[in-house]
Regions:
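Oxyanion-binding and handling regions
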Residues: 1-22, 34, 91-195
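N-terminal phosphate-binding loop and adjacent alpha-helix
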Residues: 32-48
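DPxDG-like acidic metal-binding loop motif
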Residues: 59-90, 95
Length: 195
């Protein structure tokens, strides 16, 4: 099965093709607020790198949020359209779970603005603490491998390769049964995105 994986939820554009437990081709770039401009160009590039036809994919996997208001919607809109038109399977994974890379005892932190962060804690991909929005002062990273925007809480910023993370977290992909009902997991009210 050839799966197109996409993440545009935060400041990265990650596109990869995974087949039989291997990455066939991948593009991982930081391009905050430019994903919508770059995604189709990079999709063409991805399929050229892989020497595969776009019609060869059997499924699509995307991050479902949290993330930037527009960012989460970019990959989701593309994936829903492809899956619906081509009758493909569609899978989702939490952005924070993906960014944990399936590693042990990992706290993922992503800037949510206004002195807050999206935080999720995972152990080998399993949820220890559900994804939530927290005030920066309330986050205690002690005893955790901190991934993401660690500098928000006095740690180093650290990020795994997102395309590789899709592969390492495959067991946690959730199949979408009703594409029409798939909506982003924002975790905060829409008006707070403008702060």
């Amino acid at each position: 099965m050839l799966t197109l994986c996409m993440d545009t939820a935060y400041k990265y554009l990650s596109l990869s093709l995974i087949e039989d437990g291997k990455i066939v081709a991948a593009i991982d770039e930081e391009c905050f607020k430019k994903q919508s401009e770059m995604v189709f160009v990079k999709l063409d590039e991805l399929f050229c790198m892989a020497k595969r036809d776009r019609l060869a994919i059997d499924s699509v996997c995307i991050t479902s949020g949290p993330g930037s208001y527009t960012g989460v919607r970019i990959a989701m809109t593309i994936a829903k359209t492809i899956a619906e038109v081509a009758k493909l399977k569609l899978f989702t994974i939490s952005t924070l779970r993906l960014y944990s890379n399936g590693e042990k005892n990992t706290m993922v932190i992503m800037d949510a603005r206004a002195s807050r962060a999206y935080v999720g804690i995972y152990d080998n991909g399993n949820t220890v603490m559900k994804d939530q929005v927290m005030n920066l002062n309330d986050i205690n990273p002690e005893n955790y491998n901190v991934v993401g925007d660690g500098s928000l809480i006095g740690k180093d910023d650290k990020m795994y390769t997102i395309s590789g993370a899709f592969l390492k977290t495959m067991n946690f992909w959730e199949e979408v049964k009703e594409i029409d009902f798939l909506v982003p997991e924002y975790l905060k009210e829409s008006d707070s995105y403008y702060r």
